[in-house]
Swiss-Prot record:
Keyword Cytoplasm among UniProt keywords: no
Domain of life: Bacteria
Signal peptide segment: 1-21
Primary role: Uptake of inorganic phosphate, phosphorylated compounds, and some other negatively charged solutes.
Topological relation to the membrane, as annotated: Multi-pass membrane protein
Location in or out of the cell: Cell outer membrane
Gene: phoE
Family classification: Belongs to the Gram-negative porin family.
Protein name: Outer membrane porin PhoE
Organism: Klebsiella oxytoca
Length: 349
């Protein structure tokens, strides 16, 4: 394989973890793909709860059926299993589980556990070898990342009229009966992105608004509606990847005792893919809480990330990722300020 071909392959692989799916069935308009990875990883940190083995296995299935010339049905399921637990400790979790239909030139609609609309922007900077993407995106935190009860409409190239213009409309149903910080009321979200084609630049923006549950409103910090908006910019060409994101959340970002009334979030990443498989990475993540009861302003997340990944081929890589924590040791919310170094190898298919 030519070196330039290897670099192009790595760029495509990084852009979508699911591109490595192996086709196991394709007949009579029905197709089934499987994908997954084993990430053998160790954390080194003075923070005891983070220090040690972090190995996990991730597995997914994607299927589709051709109903007619214009209509396609599809579904996806993805799960994760911890590799650092005892055999008697059940640690499986469902990451994604949704099904829907796609109409030619009109977009797709699906329902289930999926990615929130705000993550359409946040995903551009969630590219570090291990860390990153955690200033405002958190699992089961309204529509900032993976969440349940999402009805999602997606349209690419805006009905076939504008190349590179993608639209998402999303509704999230109420989720109660769980930890208050993981709950949500009814909400909606939207995102819009535009790829400038020959320039290799893209811009995106997203907005979400949700009711908060009664349990959430009883917490000491945060009240009323939860809202967020985000905007991002990326450049992806010539073996270079650059991306930045800014977002604001209101009564949405979880902290000790409830939610921050406001959080301002910034992320940036720069990476270069060498022809021989090496990919260095430099990034920065900041989330600053504002108007917090009894606290005022305080950094919630603040770190520099330095990492490197070496791709042996499209299926195997080794990495080191160093999270250099910039939080103050005496921060008023008691957030841990220790550094973390992640070292590991990943096999994916």
């Amino acid at each position: 394989m030519k070196k330039s071909s290897l670099a192009l392959m790595m760029m495509g692989l990084i852009a979508s973890s699911a591109t490595q799916a192996a086709e196991v069935y394709n007949k009579n308009g029905n197709k089934l793909d499987v994908y997954g990875k084993v990430k053998a990883m160790h954390y080194m940190s003075d923070y005891d709860s983070k220090d040690g083995d972090q190995t996990y296995v991730r597995f997914g299935i994607k299927g589709e059926t051709q109903i007619n010339d214009d209509l396609t049905g599809y579904g996806r399921w993805e799960s994760e299993f911890s590799g650092n637990k005892t055999e008697s400790d059940s640690s499986q979790k469902t990451r994604l589980a949704f099904a829907g239909v796609k109409v030619k030139n009109y977009g797709s609609f699906d329902y289930g556990r999926n990615l929130g609309a705000l993550y359409d922007v946040e995903a551009w900077t969630d590219m570090f070898p291990e860390f990153g993407g955690d200033s405002s995106a958190q699992t089961d935190n309204f529509m900032t990342k993976r969440a349940s009860g999402l009805a999602t409409y997606r349209n690419t190239d805006f009905f076939g009229v504008v190349d590179g213009l993608d639209l998402t409309l999303q509704y999230q149903g109420k989720n109660e009966g769980r930890e208050a910080k993981k709950q949500n009321g009814d909400g909606f979200g939207t995102s819009l992105s535009y790829d400038f084609g020959g320039s290799d630049f893209a811009v995106s923006a997203a907005y979400t608004s949700s009711d908060r549950t009664n349990d959430q409103n009883l917490l000491a910090r945060g009240a009323k509606k939860a809202e967020a908006w985000a905007t991002g910019l990326k450049y992806d060409a010539n073996n270079i990847y650059l991306a930045t994101m800014y977002s604001e959340t209101r009564k949405m970002t979880p902290i000790s005792g409830g939610f921050a009334n406001k959080a301002q979030n910034f992320e940036a990443v720069a990476q270069y893919q060498f022809d021989f498989g090496l990919r260095p990475s430099l990034g920065y993540v900041l989330s600053k809480g504002k108007d917090i009861e009894g606290v005022g302003s305080e950094d919630l997340v603040n770190y520099i990330d330095v990492g490197v990944t070496y791709y042996f081929n499209k299926n195997m890589n080794a990495f080191v990722d160093y999270k250099i924590n910039q939080l103050k040791s005496d921060n008023k919310l008691g957030i841990n300020d220790d550094d973390i170094v992640a070292v590991g190898m990943t096999y994916q298919f």
